[in-house]
Amino acid sequence: ATDYEDEEFPGAVPPSVGAR
C-alpha cells in the first residue's frame, strides 16, 4: 500500500492514515 485507502488494508486502518 502507499498511503491512505484500503489497498492492502481491507477493513483496517493503515499506519499512514493513523499517523497523519
Curated annotation (Swiss-Prot):
The gene is FGB. One of its GO terms (cellular component) is extracellular region. A long coiled coil structure formed by 3 polypeptide chains connects the central nodule to the C-terminal domains (distal nodules). The long C-terminal ends of the alpha chains fold back, contributing a fourth strand to the coiled coil structure. The lineage of its organism: Eukaryota, Metazoa, Chordata, Craniata, Vertebrata. Conversion of fibrinogen to fibrin is triggered by thrombin, which cleaves fibrinopeptides A and B from alpha and beta chains, and thus exposes the N-terminal polymerization sites responsible for the formation of the soft clot. It comes from Elephas maximus (Indian elephant). This is Fibrinogen beta chain. Keywords: Adaptive immunity, Blood coagulation, Coiled coil, Disulfide bond, Glycoprotein, Hemostasis, Immunity, Innate immunity, Secreted, Sulfation. Heterohexamer; disulfide linked. Contains 2 sets of 3 non-identical chains (alpha, beta and gamma). The 2 heterotrimers are in head to head conformation with the N-termini in a small central domain. One of its GO terms (biological process) is adaptive immune response.
